[in-house]
Amino acid sequence: MATKVKFKYKGEEKEVDISKIKKVWRVGKMISFTYDDNGKTGRGAVSEKDAPKELLDKLEKK
């Protein structure tokens, strides 16, 4: 089962599969990321406490 990251972007609830996430970085207490949105680059952010473990693992690997 693939992990999904739920986040809000411009007031809209979104969800992205962790396998589509390309780049992850920390901004204060938020975890920001870019992901493949059907050929375009999508952006998202989630608070550190709401981030799934797999997303935090990607952050540590950089």
Curated annotation (Swiss-Prot):
Main localization is cytoplasm
List the GO terms this entry assigns under cellular component, sorted alphabetically.
Answer: cytoplasm
Homology family: Belongs to the 7 kDa DNA-binding/endoribonuclease P2 family.
UniProt xrefs under Pfam families: 7kD_DNA_binding
Q: How does activity depend on pH?
A: Highly stable from pH 0 to pH 12.
Name this polypeptide is given? DNA-binding protein 7b
> How would you summarize the temperature dependence of activity?
Hyperthermostable.
Which parts form a coiled-coil structure per UniProt? none
